[in-house]
UniProtKB/Swiss-Prot annotation:
The gene is rpsO. SUPFAM superfamilies: S15/NS1 RNA-binding domain. Signal peptide: none annotated. It comes from the Bacteria. Keywords: Ribonucleoprotein, Ribosomal protein, RNA-binding, rRNA-binding. GO terms for biological process: translation. It holds the Pfam family Ribosomal_S15. GO terms for cellular component: cytosolic small ribosomal subunit. This is Small ribosomal subunit protein uS15. One of the primary rRNA binding proteins, it binds directly to 16S rRNA where it helps nucleate assembly of the platform of the 30S subunit by binding and bridging several RNA helices of the 16S rRNA. Forms an intersubunit bridge (bridge B4) with the 23S rRNA of the 50S subunit in the ribosome. The keyword Ribosomal protein applies.
Amino acid sequence: MDKQEKSLIINEFKKSENDTGSTEVQVALLTARIHQLTTHMIANKHDFHTKRSLLTLVGRRRRLLSYMRNNNGAGYQELIANLGLRK
């Protein structure tokens, strides 16, 4: 993910002008990175280092989503709808 792609994601999910670290932004950035690593893993099945990194990112996103579900239920529902994470 390059700087331009990252800034587009931040601009889409930020809450205020200087927001770069809110839970929504973090989850959106992690989701983009997870999608990149998933496509890499399809092409490179034996890349175990990347597989471990992918599982770490998925766990981090899961914890952030759990935090958000417990503290901001409406924002959680909106975020997963925007990212298309759950049905």
